[in-house]
Amino acid sequence: LEQYRAAEDGRVFFRREEARPYVFLEEDIILEKEIDFLLKKLEHRHQDYLKIIGSQCMGAAVDEEWLSRGVYNHFSRVFFLTEPGLPHDDALPAGEYACLYYRGAYDRLEEHCGVLLAGIAAAGRRPAGPPLELYRVDAHDTNREEEYVTELQMRVE
């Protein structure tokens, strides 16, 4: 909680990321309400080394096909970032990412994605991948929804 308490809400910033290995679970359509269940299923599947990591970062990728239709609450996969040297399914590509933190419930994703996309355009950049929701502080950390911290990331070019 403390690490993200000072994160400024709603401000778009850019950060260079190295390739980040992860394990994932992919479905045809993942609705927002199914994310927690699928993350638990994924965690169970990889429990041997996800427990070793401890405070691993988990997230979901917004489905680009649905996003192109203006639907923001459909996801293509859920994932746990792992660490180099541990088993993984894929890696988020290295590169520059536009980022934005927001607090509270997950029901305002469309609004936050709009702010992120506007910040990308204002910087003269273009999206180069789907929006990623990274759950920095969630129900596993606090039972107070107003303390949830989500980071949106989108690779840019």
Question: Model regions: which residues?
Answer:
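A solvent-exposed interaction/effector surface
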Residues: L1-E157
